[in-house]
Amino acid sequence: MAVQVENTPVNKPVEVGNETALLLKDLKENGDYVNSKVFPSLIKASIVNESLGKNILVIDLRSTNEFTEGHIKGAVNKKFSELPSYFETGIKPFEYDKIILVSEDGQISSYTTCLLRLMGYGNVYSMRWGMSAWNNRYAQEGWLKGVSGKYETKLENTVNERPSSNGMPDLRTGLQSGPEIGTTRFRKLFEEGTADIFITADEVFSNPQKYYIINLDRKDKYEDGHIPGAVRYKPEGTLGYTDEMASIPADKPVVVYCGTGHNSGFATAYLRLFGYDAHTLKYGNNGFMYNKMVKQRTALSWLPFTQAEVNNFEVVK
């Protein structure tokens, strides 16, 4: 069954499946997180460090070996797949002022934070830059190794038009209420894990035509140079709007990218919730046009990862 959903007075109604409409309605009525002032929910390492010993919980999503070799004092180590049950029965989430997710470079924690926020946990944050911002050891192993200017000469300035709206993926859970549909979709995403979430610049630039590429950034940044074929979507006013989302192909792999991979991680979580085969580009623009970002940092307010982002905070074993 198709349902017409009209978001704005100027755009024609978009037909979406009944389950999609119910889930959209439920998320909108419960805070419309992706269009709120707290989206994306990122927190600086310096604030996390200042908050240690206070009423916060740090959840480290890295592997057991990485956690054992060194972690933030007081942090607990949890696998991505364990989080739903941990939040339901392992802790009382709302007794904490903040729950902070930490990963190697802030990419997985951004994706995960969005899912948990959409599930109703409104005090969850992702630590920006991940452990790379905590001290130099992790920066050398993470972000400073990940930045690259490898494809700066492969960018284009063409303004690529969006395709016509073709609806959104059918969710097909067989359920008839927004909350039930959401619960089933969240469970599925956590069961699927994170192995298929990320994509690298090498993969994208080797065959950009294979993907529908979404540039999630300002117009001036997009027009100054972007991945060939990329289509710009506004960082605000895209997610949750069917007239925007319906132009994203449901039958093609989708790559979402921004400056750092943080915002695109949040957006990718939302798109995957609604059935898109979406992937976030690891490190964002930092992973393929880093030198250009550094040179134009002031002119276009880019956010390249530099040594200035790295702190000297201690870890414990």
Regions found by a protein language model. Give the residues of each.
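Rhodanese-like catalytic fold shared by cysteine-dependent sulfurtransferases
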Residues: 1-42, 68-98, 107-196, 222-253, ...
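Mature N-terminal segment immediately following signal peptide/propeptide cleavage
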Residues: 36, 49, 54-57, 61-62
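Structural motif
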Residues: 57, 98-100, 212, 253
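Short hydrophobic beta-strand that contains or immediately precedes a catalytic carboxylate
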Residues: 57-62, 75-78, 212-216, 230-233
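Short, surface-exposed ligand- or partner-binding patches at beta-edge/loop junctions that are enriched
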Residues: 102, 257
